[in-house]
Regions:
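Generic structural motif
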Residues: 5, 29-44, 48, 97-100
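Zn2+-dependent peptidoglycan hydrolase active-site motif and core
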Residues: 20, 36-87, 109-123
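Polar/charged, compositionally biased leader and regulatory segments
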Residues: 1-37
Length: 142
């Protein structure tokens, strides 16, 4: 199936004098459903932010998010953070997300830049092997 959408900001890209700490993907449609690539366990969530209401302080900049542990690999545990989601998902810490389930829908909660125009809706994606951040683009295919 692969990834749908366009990468609008790469990991490490300089924005406002600061290196971007994730990969931004513009979805192919509004509130695009994000599907779990495999079974995972929710290790962090944040909800309660409306789309389009800019948050500028602390963790609120992340907007609504789901942080998922996908198990061990030869490089350590695989962790993925899905950020700026639309409100409405109900995952809680400790929940198991089955492979193929909807994690959430893309949105523009938190602090979203409009570098690609429009509302600023996008998925901010961060991926880690253990404590080492890796570039998720290396694992994305069309």
């Amino acid at each position: 199936s692969g990834w749908k959408g366009m990468v609008s900001s790469h990991l490490g890209a300089i924005r406002g004098g600061v290196a971007h700490n994730g990969t931004d993907i513009v979805p192919p449609s509004v509130m695009y459903s994000l599907i779990a690539p495999s079974q995972g366990i929710v290790i962090g969530t944040q909800t309660g932010f409306a789309n389009g209401v800019t948050q500028t302080k602390g963790n609120a900049q992340r907007g609504n998010f789901v942080f998922v542990y996908y198990g061990e690999s030869s490089s350590g545990g695989v962790f993925v953070l899905y950020q700026h989601l639309s409100p409405g998902f109900s995952w809680k810490i400790g929940d198991t997300i089955p492979a193929g389930a909807v994690i959430g829908q893309t949105g523009w909660s938190g602090l979203c830049y409009s570098s690609h125009g429009g509302t600023g809706e996008h998925l901010h994606l961060e991926m880690y092997y253990g404590t080492q951040q890796v570039n998720p683009e290396a694992y994305m295919s069309n």
